[in-house]
């Protein structure tokens, strides 16, 4: 900000030397020797500085007080003063006015005991360190209006400078409240500290700002590692406070400065003036960390509490109010690790902080990208000091440095919502801001909650981050790349933009331990932009290591990728931020998807785990790439990257990659995390990877088993998507066992739909049966994005990677499958068998809410006893329509290959509802497996597989028309496959064999009677649908068959059959008619329904049809519209196209296109093109595209290949009349090409004009534009015979249209032009054309004659 803008009270004197106190207060240093400021700075000002001079601050405060809120630093030491503003007064600062007088008043009011202030814990004698929250003016207003004064007081804290001891506090300085819309163009804050000078300013709108542009962040790195001398400068003596508030207009160099300020020794105040969101910066000196500590906390645990401005402030009060404690550091008084405190000698300095979430793209994600930012070295001494008793809150200026500032800017309303979410916590748990953790914390954010409860006092509690933006406002997280790199000694490294130790007694004192943590939270104006939390607490090497990192990215309307890399250079027990928890760690509840890599090796091994959360809204795709590598370990653990893809109605999309590695001895102790509340499971798409070390027997990470205690040590990851009954179809799980040793894997997935939680497998069943046995099981389903409430399908990958074993398949059972049983309860068990077996087989399909027309509507959402069959693959037969059967035979051959065989009983239309599938595989015999399933007829099909490669099916009356085979490793994408039998090698069962010629229909009677049209036709003699002939050819084909086309009688299903059995007529029924038809089909018996309309053929259900209509309204992609038109019968399509759409699923296909990056890019391009093309603003997307192609074609070089390509495309587009009106506007250009182009160019132009001449209206336009003369010129030029023939065809079309006598009668608007058309020249031209035609014919005959 320029000096001019700075108000008198806010201006800092540039002339002050670095040695002086804060520039604002420097000049009045002699004048205000005693400046009293409450330890808790309740400056509620929304970012406006008092217009009064610093000296004019609320009055001199005793030297003992921290600092004057007015912006003047007092030289006094920071000591806790029981002064706090009254709850009501604290809040009432007028955002725009905030004068020194009011501050002084507030200061007086603050004389009230600290207990009154929500920031000060009543119990703690020492006042928690003052936090300076810079709240936007508007937010303050909002808060004052909407938030109880008590609650909002914390939010309104003006960035006030820390106590003298804290020496220079970096504080964001804003000259005056700035309206939300106004960017802080002029305000830049540069904090000149010695070497560590960092300045940060955030222009919300300004990309140049350091934090906003991600690129700029590089130099800044939020965590700038500072040399010890820098640290000293930071912990500079209070006399030397060099707190420069340099007001300058936004300059790049300043932007490059680090975005945070830290008090050298004292709590650093960070008030960021981020304008748009409430920006709460909170600083905590390590002793004062507990400023946020809940007032109700007896122990005065030092817990950092962050609260966000706006509603957040109240959030703090609210959650705490509930508990009676603002933010309670749940840890006992004895355990006094300051959450954020970093103790350190003067030389040691922790720099931490960071962030602004500027705009959606925000800097923080950007800054995160830089590796250096977060690094900060912290000596062990500091770590120990962290754990110092809270009672010793007296400032240790030299030793301690403020370590991080946590800044969250959010919009007021988003904060409020977030806070309300917080309130979901259990009564006894305090919620602090969006972020908090507490020892017995049971609270979970309604959107996201992580509960960490230490089992014992000595255990530290993992940090808990609650923050979900506005439920829907939070979209995809901005791209954040965070890399934590220890920069200090190997043994002592603190990495993290934000670090805290929850439990005081967390043995941070161990010398070899380092704590890394980074927490980033950024929020955009309208929604949380992103949040990253990294919390590490590390007990001594002897104790369990706990690392927590939580990454959360949420961004408004932007697709972002989050990538976190955590690498540990320290060979000692270093823990990396990405979040994870150690074995002994109390179970943590994660409300969100984690991508976790756990490596619990020797105690000195670092545990690296990234946890990313991508929260996506409104069909935003968030891709999370989590990579963690430890350098002391030979093999880096890379957690799988997953992208969360979300459909518009999906609330969240999240991906989960989970990779646990545990020591053999601790494998069973693996921590289990779950979130209790179903609402906490927004994941829609997960990918789970479980890697076991050579020695570990079991790994037991459970993700989100909300109802189930973590009673088992069985490796299991629970994945399910439960968000509003919407499940992403991308769910997938992959489990890799690099070791041959026996492990127990149990991956459970269940959908959390509505209020019910479905447990796919029984936990008890997944117990290891023998030491040598390996049980691998995971349930997965890929549900179509958000279409069906529960997970409908299971796509499961269990990959076993021993050298001798190979598993292939999107779905398959692990290396030694002894048996798989399909039980209606939805449980199955796989018992390991031969090690060397190779099980190959895959089957994949996507499900729709209602799959299949007729009997096959499958909705795996509802899990009634009679419906859901969970087996190696899950088919839930929906209500009346029972799935005929799912059969899986996993048969290891002698050489170790098991081939799954799926048998689907015959025609669905005649399927009996009584089918139960049993799949048995006996690896011991290796010789045969019997698969039984209820066939559509009374008879049963018995499939015997001799050594897995022999399959014969026998049916009575050939119930299965044709077998469908696929290899085990091949995926089939049919939603509801037709009768299927998979045989390994038997040629006689192969679909390649032609049907017996004797079975071919010999007449139309046989065809129409024996093969009634049905909703599906597959192998064997195809049903009638595959044969589609034009109406004009029907009689011709009838004569060829020796009969007349036979009409099909109207069936009892109230649906008339098509006139010609081989004819496909698109149905142009209205939406209302289609709805009625689909309802009638659902109400009818599936066996009796027979209809070959396009909706029935594509198996579109009522719900799917409604969703299709919504997608057409919300999307403008021309390709998606074409697919929708085909599905609605408005466009004809080839059989291949219809089969493809049916097999893929209409909604699944459209959703895939909507989420496919190139599709989105194309759609964006076309939308931009429309905006940039005012000449045709009323055209739809495809018409706009046609216009663009025409214009580009004329711009290309004459006769060039690009021009020919454009002409060819336009010719194809004009085969239908839809785009004639668009193309005809460019006739002049086409005539030019007709005269100037070569023979090939003229050929393509003439073909285009031939298409136009087939339309009456276009024929009229051709005549008006005098196209006849152009054609005659070509006659005279003696063009090629091909071109002459096309011209003659055009004349023939024109002649036919003229004879219809409707040519000039249709359009009354152009009567004048009609009158202008003179038919005499046309008649002469036609006669001349006729002469040319005769001559051409004669020439052709001469060539043919010998």
Swiss-Prot record:
Listed Low complexity bias regions: 21-36
Region (Disordered) residue spans: 1-101, 144-177, 192-258, 311-399, 461-485, 984-1004
Transmembrane segments: none
Biased composition (Basic residues): 211-226, 316-333
Record's compositionally biased regions (Polar residues): 461-484
Reported tissue expression: Expressed in the brain.
Record bears the keyword Ribonucleoprotein: no
Annotated positions of the Phosphothreonine modification: 860
The entry's keywords: Cytoplasm, Phosphoprotein
Pfam families (UniProt xref): Arm_2 (PF04826)
Residues bearing the modification Phosphoserine: 295, 619, 626, 862
Basic and acidic residues composition-biased segments: 347-361, 370-399, 990-1003
Location of this chain's protein in the cell: Cytoplasm
Record's GO cellular component terms: cytosol; nucleus
Biological process terms in GO annotation: endosome to lysosome transport; G protein-coupled receptor catabolic process
Similarity annotation: Belongs to the GPRASP family.
Subunit structure: Interacts with cytoplasmic tails of a variety of G-protein coupled receptors such as delta opioid receptor/OPRD1, beta-2 adrenergic receptor/ADRB2 and D4 dopamine receptor/DRD4. Interacts with BECN2; the interaction is direct and with D2 dopamine receptor/DRD2. Interacts with PER1.
Function: Modulates lysosomal sorting and functional down-regulation of a variety of G-protein coupled receptors. Targets receptors for degradation in lysosomes via its interaction with BECN2.
Protein name in the entry: G-protein coupled receptor-associated sorting protein 1
Organism annotation: Rattus norvegicus (Rat)
């Amino acid at each position: 900000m320029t000096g001019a803008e700075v108000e008198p009270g806010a201006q800092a004197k540039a002339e002050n030397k670095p040695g002086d106190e804060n520039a604002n207060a420097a000049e009045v240093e002699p004048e205000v020797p005693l400046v009293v400021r409450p330890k808790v700075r309740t400056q509620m000002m929304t970012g406006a500085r008092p217009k009064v001079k610093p000296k004019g601050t609320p009055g001199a405060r005793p030297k003992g007080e921290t600092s004057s809120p007015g912006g003047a630093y007092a030289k006094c030491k920071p000591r806790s003063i029981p002064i706090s503003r009254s709850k009501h007064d604290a809040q009432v600062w007028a955002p725009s006015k905030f004068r020194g007088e009011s501050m002084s008043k507030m200061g007086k009011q603050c004389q009230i005991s600290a207990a009154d202030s929500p920031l000060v814990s009543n119990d703690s004698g020492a006042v928690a360190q003052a936090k300076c929250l810079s709240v936007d003016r508007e937010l303050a207003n909002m808060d004052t209006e909407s938030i109880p004064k008590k609650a909002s007081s914390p939010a309104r804290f003006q960035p006030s400078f820390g106590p003298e001891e804290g020496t220079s506090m970096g504080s964001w300085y804003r000259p005056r409240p700035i309206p939300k819309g106004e960017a802080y163009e002029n305000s830049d804050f540069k904090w000149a500290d010695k070497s560590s000078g960092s300045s940060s300013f955030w222009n919300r709108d300004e990309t140049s700002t350091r934090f906003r542009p991600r690129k700029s962040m590089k130099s800044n790195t939020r965590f700038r590692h500072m040399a010890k001398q820098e640290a000293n400068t930071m912990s500079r003596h209070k006399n030397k406070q060099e707190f420069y508030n340099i007001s300058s207009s936004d300059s790049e160099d300043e932007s490059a400065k680090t975005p945070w300020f830290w008090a050298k020794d004292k709590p650093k105040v960070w008030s960021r003036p981020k304008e748009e969101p409430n920006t709460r910066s909170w600083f905590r000196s390590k002793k004062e960390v507990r400023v946020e500590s809940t007032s109700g906390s007896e122990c005065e645990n030092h817990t950092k509490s962050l609260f966000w401005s706006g509603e957040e402030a109240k959030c703090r009060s609210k959650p705490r109010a509930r508990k009676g404690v603002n933010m309670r550091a749940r840890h006992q008084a004895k355990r006094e690790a300051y959450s954020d405190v970093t103790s350190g000698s003067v030389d040691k300095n922790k720099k931490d902080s960071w962030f602004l979430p500027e705009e959606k793209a925000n800097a923080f994600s950007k800054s995160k990208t830089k590796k250096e930012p977060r690094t900060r070295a912290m000596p062990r001494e500091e770590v120990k000091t962290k754990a110092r008793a809270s009672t010793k809150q007296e400032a240790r200026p030299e030793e301690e440095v403020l370590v991080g500032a946590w800044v969250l800017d959010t919009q007021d309303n988003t904060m409020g919502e977030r806070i309300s979410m917080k309130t979901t916590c259990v009564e006894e748990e305090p919620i602090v801001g969006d972020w908090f953790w507490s020892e017995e914390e049971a609270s979970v954010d309604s959107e996201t909650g992580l509960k960490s409860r230490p089992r014992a006092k000595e255990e530290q509690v993992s940090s808990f981050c609650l923050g979900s933006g506005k439920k829907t406002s939070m979209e995809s997280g901005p791209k954040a790349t965070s890399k934590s790199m220890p920069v200090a000694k190997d043994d002592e490294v603190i990495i993290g933009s934000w670090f805290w130790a929850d439990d005081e007694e967390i043995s941070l004192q161990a010398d070899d331990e380092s704590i890394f943590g980074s927490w980033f939270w950024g929020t955009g104006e309208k929604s949380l932009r992103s949040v990253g939390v990294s919390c590490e607490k590390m007990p001594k090497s002897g104790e369990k290591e706990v690392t927590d990192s939580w990454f959360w990215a949420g961004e408004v309307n932007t697709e972002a990728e989050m990538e976190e890399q955590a690498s540990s250079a320290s060979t000692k027990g270093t823990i990396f931020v990405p979040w994870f928890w150690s074995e002994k760690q109390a179970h943590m509840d994660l409300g969100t998807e984690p991508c976790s890599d756990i490596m619990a090796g020797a105690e000195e091994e670092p545990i690296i785990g990234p946890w990313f959360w991508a929260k996506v809204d409104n069909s935003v795709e968030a891709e999370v790439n989590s990579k963690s590598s430890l350098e002391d370990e030979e093999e880096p653990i890379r957690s799988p990257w997953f992208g969360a893809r979300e459909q518009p109605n999906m609330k969240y999309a999240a991906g989960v990659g989970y990779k646990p590695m545990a020591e053999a001895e601790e494998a069973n102790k693996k921590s289990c995390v779950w979130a209790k509340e179903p609402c906490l499971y927004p994941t829609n798409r997960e990918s789970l990877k479980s890697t076991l070390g050579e020695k570990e027997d079991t790994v037991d990470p459970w993700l989100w088993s909300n109802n189930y205690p973590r009673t088992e040590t069985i490796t299991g990851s629970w994945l399910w998507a439960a968000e509003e009954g919407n499940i992403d179809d991308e769910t997938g799980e992959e489990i890799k066992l690099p070791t041959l040793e026996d492990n127990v894997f149990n991956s459970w997935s269940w959908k959390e739909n509505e209020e019910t939680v479905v447990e796919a497998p029984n936990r008890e069943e997944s117990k290891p049966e023998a030491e040598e046995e390996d049980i691998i099981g995971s349930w997965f389903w890929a549900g179509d994005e958000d279409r069906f409430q529960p997970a409908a399908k299971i796509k499961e990958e269990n990959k076993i990677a021993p050298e001798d074993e190979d598993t292939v398949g999107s779905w398959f059972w692990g290396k030694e499958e002894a048996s798989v049983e399909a039980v209606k309860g939805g449980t199955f068990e796989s018992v390991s068998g031969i090690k060397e077996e190779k099980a190959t087989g895959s089957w994949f399909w996507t499900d729709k809410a209602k799959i299949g027309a007729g009997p096959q509507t499958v909705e795996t959402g509802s899990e009634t006893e009679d419906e859901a069959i969970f087996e190696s693959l899950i088919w839930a037969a929906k209500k009346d329509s029972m799935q005929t059967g799912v059969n899986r035979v996993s048969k290891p051959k002698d050489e170790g290959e098991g081939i799954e065989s799926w048998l689907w009983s015959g025609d669905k239309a005649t399927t009996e509802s009584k089918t139960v599938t049993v799949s048995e595989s006996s690896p011991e015999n290796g010789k045969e497996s019997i698969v039984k399933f209820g066939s559509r007829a009374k008879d049963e099909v018995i499939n015997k597989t001799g050594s897995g490669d022999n399959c014969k099916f026998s049916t009575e009356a050939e119930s299965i028309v044709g077998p469908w085979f696929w290899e085990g490793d091949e995926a089939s994408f049919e939603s509801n496959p037709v009768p299927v039998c998979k045989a390994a090698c038997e040629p006689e069962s192969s679909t390649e064999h032609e049907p017996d010629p004797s079975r071919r229909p010999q007449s139309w009677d046989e065809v129409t009677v024996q093969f009634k049209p049905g909703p599906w036709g597959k192998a064997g003699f195809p049903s009638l649908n595959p044969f589609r002939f034009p109406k004009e050819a029907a009689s011709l084909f009838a004569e060829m068959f020796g009969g007349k086309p036979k009409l099909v009688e109207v069936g009892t299903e109230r649906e008339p059959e098509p006139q010609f059995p081989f004819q496909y007529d698109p149905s142009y029924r209205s939406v209302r008619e289609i709805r009625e038809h689909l309802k009638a089909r659902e109400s009818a018996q599936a066996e009796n329904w027979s209809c070959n309309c396009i909706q029935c053929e594509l198996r579109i259900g009522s719900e799917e049809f409604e969703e299709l209509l919504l997608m057409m309204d919300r999307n403008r992609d021309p390709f998606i519209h074409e697919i929708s038109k085909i599905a609605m019968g408005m466009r004809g399509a080839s059989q291949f196209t219809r089969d493809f759409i049916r097999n893929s699923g209409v909604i699944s296909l459209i959703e895939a296109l909507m989420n496919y990056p190139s599709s989105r890019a194309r759609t964006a391009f076309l939308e931009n093109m429309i905006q940039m093309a005012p000449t045709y603003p009323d055209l739809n997307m495809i018409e706009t595209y046609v216009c663009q192609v025409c214009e580009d074609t004329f711009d290309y070089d004459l006769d060039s290949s690009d021009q020919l390509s454009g002409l060819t495309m336009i010719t194809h587009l004009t085969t239908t009349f839809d785009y004639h009106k668009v193309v005809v506007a460019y006739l002049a250009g086409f005539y030019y090409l007709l005269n100037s182009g070569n023979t090939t160019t003229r050929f393509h132009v003439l073909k285009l004009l031939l298409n136009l001449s087939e339309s009456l209206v276009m024929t009229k336009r051709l005549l008006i534009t005098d196209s006849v003369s152009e054609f005659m010129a070509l006659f005279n030029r003696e063009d090629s015979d091909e071109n002459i023939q096309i011209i003659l065809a055009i004349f023939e079309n024109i002649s036919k249209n003229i004879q219809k006598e409707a040519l000039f009668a249709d359009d009354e608007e152009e009567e004048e032009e009609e009158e202008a058309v003179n038919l005499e020249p046309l008649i002469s031209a036609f006669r001349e054309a006729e002469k040319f035609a005769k001559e051409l014919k004669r020439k052709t005959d001469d060539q043919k004659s010998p």
